[in-house]
């Protein structure tokens, strides 16, 4: 059995200040989760209640409900408290249904892939 290093323990105890507060959690894979922190352990594993994933593509966004959600600590990049009195998003953002945001994500991914292949084709030009 391995024990947590002292640095791990200090990191997770600082999460105690966030208990029962609305948080934004950024994961290694780029997903953004929001919810109420209900529990955590010495490895920064966390339990979010009323969790949802916020997907943003351009000026479109969608909140996908997840319910009670367990996050493995090693996947967390950033945790921050959200100000419940402040507006979460700029006024120009438009909320869309989940199906539409998935289509927008797919189109954005294909566009990025196309840009990458075009860059590779033009490498011989040495534009840098």
Curated annotation (Swiss-Prot):
One of its GO terms (cellular component) is Lsm1-7-Pat1 complex. InterPro entries: Lsm1, LSM_dom_sf, PTHR15588, Sm, Sm_dom_euk/arc. The keyword Cytoplasm applies. The keyword Zinc does not apply. It is found in: Cytoplasm; Cytoplasm, P-body. Residues 10-85 form the Sm domain. Disruption phenotype: No visible phenotype under normal growth conditions, but the double mutants lsm1a and lsm1b show severe developmental alterations, such as delayed seed germination, reduced root length, epinastic, chlorotic and small cotyledons, small and serrated leaves, abnormal venation in cotyledons and leaves, dwarf plants with early flowering, short siliques with reduced seed number and small morphologically alterated seeds. One of its GO terms (molecular function) is RNA binding. Belongs to the snRNP Sm proteins family. Component of the cytoplasmic LSM1-LSM7 complex which is involved in mRNA degradation by promoting decapping and leading to accurate 5'-3' mRNA decay. LSM1A and LSM1B are essential for the formation of the cytoplasmic LSM1-LSM7 complex which regulates developmental gene expression by the decapping of specific development-related transcripts. Required for P-body formation during heat stress. PANTHER family: LSM1 (PTHR15588), SM-LIKE PROTEIN LSM1A (PTHR15588:SF21). This is Sm-like protein LSM1A. The lineage of its organism: Eukaryota, Viridiplantae, Streptophyta, Embryophyta, Tracheophyta.
């Amino acid at each position: 059995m391995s024990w947590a290093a002292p640095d791990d323990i200090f990191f997770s105890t600082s999460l105690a200040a966030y208990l029962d507060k609305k948080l934004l959690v950024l994961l290694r894979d780029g997903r953004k989760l929001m919810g109420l922190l209900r529990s955590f352990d010495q490895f920064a594993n966390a339990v979010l209640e009323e969790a949802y994933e916020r997907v943003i593509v351009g000026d479109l966004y969608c909140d996908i409900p997840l319910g009670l959600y367990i996050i493995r600590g090693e996947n967390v990049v950033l945790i921050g408290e959200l100000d419940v009195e402040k507006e979460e998003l700029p006024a120009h953002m438009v909320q869309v249904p989940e199906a539409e945001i998935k289509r927008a994500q797919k189109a954005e991914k294909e566009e990025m892939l196309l840009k990458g292949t075009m860059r590779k084709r033009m490498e011989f030009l040495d534009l840098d």
